[in-house]
């Protein structure tokens, strides 16, 4: 039986966390610098533990104004400090709840920059390794960040997206472009099954891009997204694909 991990961003202030955590195998918990805060983090950790969902840290640039989606030119030392701050905050909450962090997935602009920028990718990988060498680093399948992480002796998780279109080079179509998102549930489900069962995805130019699908990112920031997440779970189970971290 094929297996796949399902992850989503949690503790960002949306009202669907508890419902979403009943569908997921992994939760990317926001660490307060792009959204959410201590209260949301603690609730998310509790819910994740109750539902036996793997916990991941979801650090970002310090950018609450733009939800962490704006690229920032931080020095290496500034980025290290912000990463340590966020990882440390989530670890403290996990320690208090008897839970553990298993992986790190950068958020938004930090995720996208690290996928292509060696300097940023290496700072992230080295900071994570120094914080806890047993943590895994989750990132875009085939990205530079995952290659750098492996060089830095970190285990990695290759991630694919249910609701994003892909460029021919395997990167995501930028949100600034009108065709960035997969709007149709039917198309998104077809894309998920193609990535999980065949290891490939159709790029916007029609070419086939090979992808290593170890975890699927879902979004749950509105009611439609929650219903869509339920449909993804149903389709995976229907195709005998086990959801597990």
Swiss-Prot record:
UniProt-listed Enzyme Commission number(s): 3.5.2.9
Annotated disulfide bonds: none
CDD domains: LamB_YcsF_YbgL_like
Keywords assigned by UniProt, alphabetized: ATP-binding, Hydrolase, Nucleotide-binding
Family: Belongs to the LamB/PxpA family.
PANTHER family: 5-OXOPROLINASE SUBUNIT A, UNCHARACTERIZED PROTEIN YBGL-RELATED
Primary role: Catalyzes the cleavage of 5-oxoproline to form L-glutamate coupled to the hydrolysis of ATP to ADP and inorganic phosphate.
Name by which UniProt lists this protein: 5-oxoprolinase subunit A
């Amino acid at each position: 039986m094929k297996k796949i991990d399902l992850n989503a961003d949690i503790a960002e202030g949306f009202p669907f966390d508890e419902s979403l955590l009943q569908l997921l195998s992994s939760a990317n918990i926001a660490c307060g610098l792009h959204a959410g805060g201590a209260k949301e983090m603690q609730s998310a950790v509790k819910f994740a533990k109750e539902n036996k969902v793997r916990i991941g840290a979801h650090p970002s640039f310090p950018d609450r104004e733009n939800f962490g989606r704006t690229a920032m030119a931080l020095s290496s030392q500034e980025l290290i400090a912000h990463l340590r701050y966020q990882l440390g905050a989530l670890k403290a909450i996990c320690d208090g709840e008897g839970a553990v962090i298993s992986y790190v997935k950068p958020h938004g602009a930090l995720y996208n920059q690290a996928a292509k920028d060696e300097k940023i990718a290496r700072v992230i990988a080295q900071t994570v390794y120094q914080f806890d060498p047993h943590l895994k680093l989750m990132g875009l399948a085939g990205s530079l960040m995952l290659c750098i992480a492996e060089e830095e002796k970190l285990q990695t998780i290759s991630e694919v997206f249910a609701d994003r279109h892909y460029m021919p080079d395997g990167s995501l179509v930028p949100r600034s472009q009108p065709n960035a998102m997969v709007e149709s549930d039917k198309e998104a489900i077809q894309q998920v099954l193609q990535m999980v069962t065949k290891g490939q995805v159709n790029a916007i130019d029609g070419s086939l891009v090979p992808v290593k699908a170890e975890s699927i990112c879902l979004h749950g920031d509105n009611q439609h997204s929650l219903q869509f997440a339920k449909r993804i779970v149903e389709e995976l189970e229907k195709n005998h694909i086990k959801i597990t971290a």
